[in-house]
Amino acid sequence: MEYEQNLILDINPQTGLTTNSKNVIKLRLLRNSQFAKWLSECSESLKNWIISNNLEPKPGSILRVPDKDMRIIEVIAIIGNENNFWDISRINKQLSSGNYQIEFIYNDKNESKNNLAIAWALENYLFSPFNAGLNKSEKKAGLSKLVLKRSEIKSIAPLLNGIFLTRDLINSPANIVKPSILEELCKKLAKLHNAKFKVIKDNNLEINFPLIHTVGRAAEDKPRLIEISYIKNKSFPNITVIGKGVTFDSGGLDLKPPKAMELMKKDMGGAAIAIGPVSYTHLTLPTKRIV
């Protein structure tokens, strides 16, 4: 299944984050409030290039700057003064393939490089296991890639892999992601993180968790309660995360219109969130135990 590529703790190629610093194109970020000052300080030739290309101080706007041989050597990109997380996603969407390195035209100590990298990576997410016409190798080759230090990528890789995993699970149809598939996935996650794994089903489920049993007992793929338990430092508090994993809801007597029924695959979103990002927080959160 597609989600297998996210069962890693290291760099996921799908994120578009790389340590390859060859042929780097500078991605120079400028806040819209700084635009007038910056424009007044530009050389005459750059100022003419800016004006002729109608670069405006709107978040998400970009300007490609070539050298004398018309090769792109830098990109000027405008971000907002506040809440600019998704500005980076919009900027990434407009870039051609290549390796980019972020720098601020004016030093900005308050901006988190991690947040910029996360926004960049989320824009590169693609769910395509059922799209036969899409060449995934071409898609990966065509990614605009953000150059970071390996330590910087590793610090956010678990979170991004968890988010991608959650998205894949929610996007997958109910005939693919069934209770047994969720169990298989959780078992692999537990092994990956050296965590305890437990499943309650059949008679044990009926006796101890009758409501879960009642909801899913008529299904061909039987209901179950899945538990992954991470134990870290005993001096830290316990955290328990519970996610509903109804992989398909018929809507009672199937009274929902067809379009609404298509979205019922998302009824297991709670479990997907518990499995995805939450399953990776144990790497960084100061907790004794996460269940």
Features from the language model and the residues they span:
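Active-site-proximal beta-alpha loop/turn segments in soluble metabolic enzymes
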Residues: 166-172, 256-263
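Short pre-catalytic strand/loop immediately N-terminal to key active-site residues, enriched for Gly-Thr
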Residues: 238, 242, 258-266
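Short acidic/His/Gly/Ser-rich catalytic and metal-binding motifs that mark active-site loops
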Residues: 248-256
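Buried hydrophobic packing segments
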Residues: 91, 273-280
